[in-house]
Amino acid sequence: NRITVCETEEEALEGAQVVTEAIREDLELKVAMFARIEAFIDTQCIVVSNTSSYPMTQMSARMKHPERALNTHWFNPPHIIPLVEVIPGERTAQATVDVVIALLKQAGKLPVPLKKEIPGFLVNRVQMAMLRELLDLRERGVASTEEIDLAIRHSVAIRLAALGPL
């Protein structure tokens, strides 16, 4: 009874307190979707996106109330990885951030708010920096893919999980 099939967007959004956008990665499509969502929701409803491809400031450009929009960046598999990055846009209200953080905590997640938008957000940037270095090491013949995976899995991965990077 937790899933309801609706015939229209208006019906689906009626009474919603939080709406999550997760459509194809296309900025113009997302900008249009945020404006369309806003036409059907209550003035207190929060609108979030899970993308790390675009800043909320751009996606909410056509919204009348961009103060209630932000990014929440979940990680796969979400039932195992507790972290969710919370990234406000330039016009996101602090009250919106606070409500979303409280909801995420209530859902058993570990929200980490970022202070400002940055391409790729925090975790993706760190992960990609490490990936670039590991691919370079493999390309230069320092170690094979299997050896690199073994070395990282049984050293840095454990240390990072236990102590954090800083």
Language-model-detected regions and their locations in the chain:
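N-terminal alpha-helical segment
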Residues: 30, 79-80, 130, 162
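Aromatic/hydrophobic pocket-lining residues that form π-stacking "cages" and hydrophobic walls in ligand
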Residues: 37, 100, 134
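Electropositive phosphate-/nucleotide-binding environments in soluble metabolic enzymes
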Residues: 6, 27, 31, 53, ...
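Helix N-cap / loop-to-helix initiation motif
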Residues: 1, 93, 143-147
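Helical "substrate-binding/catalytic lid" subdomain
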Residues: 117-166
